[in-house]
């Protein structure tokens, strides 16, 4: 499939550029609970002056691509940000349709009221679903395009796990996806989007071409690190940037959305309306991706083997270890509250273990009511909404520390961002400490543990509810060879063949190993 769009506007003379700023950012897992209005309110849902104030903050609550875009625009010359609306939620289930309809209508109204504009910047994940629509990202972009007209530049930044659709690329003038995983280049991508916007304003239309492949690599196989196939492909794509080619984005996609736009996408943006150059390169790179598909393999460690490794790590002389509970990753729609690994570690008597972060608002509230030093029976998942995976578990515990959960990211993906876990508590269950939080999220930064008084030097095994983003922030705790991705059940399992697919286009590799594709 090949899709394209053009868009251009003359550069204004003698005045500041007026750039509309908006965003809709969520990654949706088909099998996770519906994401409601409250899910966005817990993370970020602001508009107008409030959004403008965040853009101006040194440590904004916004995603770093927004800060990077704003900084690059300011450095390039006079500009006036026109804040519209920014809605961000933790990865979860399909978005409530009523909320999404209201969001789109609000952005449309704000766009009309903001006229005249010179361009629009969108901060997007690109893998959203709603309860009634499998391509809300494309719908939103199309509605924005309809308001501003065919010639105004619209530039957007995406997660590299975006599920790209024709409607998405058709509405855009430039497409920029992250090139790191863990995602540490959000700010740089925002800066790049600003450069492309200036290029399009000065030189004319941008062209976006996309080639989709019947290939859904597991999330754990999409690590961008030395020696990985994804790193090789992204590096190859970057060698082709230059001349008419503004950007090459290689998007592995998010299979757990289970929708017809799932699949690896090669997206190329070219300047000067050079559609031929963009399409030719997209097809060439797609051929290379397809030839390398067999190298995207997920390597999981059996639970018993992982627990044994933790027991050994807790003995004198044991080396630090990270166990990644990848099947319960809040960063892909997991609840962050499965207990299989926790129970196994406690039962085995493992020492020096810290599990972070476990989402259980009721348990956090009870710990706050009890106070530091209190001993009580910790009842995990007492009112679980996920009886399949988030099973109840009770154990004697002691409250070690309490916090309001507000932290400023220090390293990796959320460095410099002010975020909140809500009321949080550090509990001790024998040799296992558990960081319990109220607002669901994955472990991304040491600050999430340090606000609870944790000294990582006292930890022998760190259990993370995360798929991979922790690697960018905890690289000094344990080297890659001491990270085990544990094979447990959960909503975000990378064992794709175990999932009840209903909307995934078939055949698709690796679900169907005989899937075929040709550039012709």
Regions found by a protein language model. Give the residues of each.
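Active-site histidine-anchored catalytic micro-motif
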Residues: 17-27, 31-33, 41, 95-104, ...
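Hard-cation-handling environments
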Residues: 220-430, 435-439
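Generic secondary-structure signature for well-ordered alpha-helical cores
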Residues: 74, 78, 109-112, 116, ...
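N-terminal amphipathic/basic leader segments beginning at the initiator methionine
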Residues: 3-72
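Internal, active-site/partner-interface "lid" segment
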Residues: 201-229
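Extended hydrophobic packing segments that form well-structured cores
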Residues: 290, 407-520
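Low-complexity, highly charged intrinsically disordered N-terminal segments
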Residues: 70-110
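Glycine-rich phosphate/diphosphate-binding loops that line cofactor/substrate pockets in enzymes
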Residues: 10-16, 75-77, 83, 109-118, ...
